[in-house]
């Protein structure tokens, strides 16, 4: 049963990170209109019809979601009853450059988890993420001032992080929060084996997101075609890494239409990487 979706509410970003694999998918990513309210209606219908205890929505995808903050606010307010009741758990991941007190207090009020992308130490982060380390650290401190704790953090793991593994782990140990390490894919990608070796090392001292049927990019098993789908460009895809492949359908289709997907592959490996070998 579908109980988790990701919605790419826009296809634009205020950064041009060197390793972003969406650069390689640019011809498949467009600004086609998508009725997010219809998607949310379909989610609410499925929650009520199937008595789903918690439905997870990630407002994440091909760009920086806070570039469309006013629309994002409307989406959050539209499902606020379900957020307040805990029936929907919503989150987003941001580069932090647009964080301010008003935005962070709004998301805190409506129980939307804010994750921030930071690639560890200044040298590595600035190499790939447009020399923004100091600004991201300021955003992290602002979040802590408002929420009384540090935000969850996302670190993309490429060769530079591997080369500075001990320094990276030491950097994140200062925050005492949950860290998602994401395997770099595409042109600058690293192998699954190298990534998993790093995860094992990091997990010995950090609270690292791992395990379960989720995504091999985050250290779990590939959950493509099981209980989650990805919305972008007015379409539905098996996952966010597959927006340059044939869509499963259009974004206005009910969730029930995607319930009977069946894919036979080794889920220790990424679905797309498996079929593209």
Where are these regions (language model features)?
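Accessory C-terminal segments flanking Radical SAM cores
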Residues: 207-277
């Amino acid at each position: 049963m579908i109980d988790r979706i990701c919605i790419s509410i826009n296809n634009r970003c205020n950064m041009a990170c060197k390793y972003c694999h969406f650069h390689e998918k640019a011809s498949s990513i467009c600004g086609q209109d998508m009725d997010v309210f219809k998607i949310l209606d379909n989610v609410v219908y499925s929650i009520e019809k199937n008595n789903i205890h918690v439905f997870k929505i990630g407002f994440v995808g091909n760009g920086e979601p806070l570039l469309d903050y006013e629309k994002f606010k409307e989406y959050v307010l539209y499902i606020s009853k379900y957020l307040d009741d805990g029936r929907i758990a919503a989150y987003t991941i941001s580069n932090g450059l647009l964080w301010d007190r008003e935005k962070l207090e709004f998301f805190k009020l409506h129980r939307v988890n804010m994750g921030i992308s930071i690639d560890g130490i200044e040298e590595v982060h600035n190499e790939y993420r447009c020399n923004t380390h100091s600004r991201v650290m300021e955003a992290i401190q602002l979040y802590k001032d408002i929420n009384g704790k540090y935000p969850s953090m996302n670190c993309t793991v490429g060769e530079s992080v591997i080369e500075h593994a001990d320094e990276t782990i030491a950097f994140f140990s200062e925050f005492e929060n949950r860290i998602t390490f994401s395997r770099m894919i595409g042109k600058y990608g690293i192998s699954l084996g190298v990534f998993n070796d790093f995860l094992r090392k990091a997990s010995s001292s950090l609270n690292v997101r791992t395990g379960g049927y989720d995504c091999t990019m985050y250290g779990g098993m590939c959950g493509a075609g099981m209980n989650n789908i990805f919305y972008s460009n007015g379409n539905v895809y098996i996952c966010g890494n597959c927006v340059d492949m044939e869509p499963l359908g259009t974004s206005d289709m009910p969730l029930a239409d995607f319930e009977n997907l069946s894919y036979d592959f080794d889920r220790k490996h990424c679905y797309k990487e498996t079929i593209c070998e």
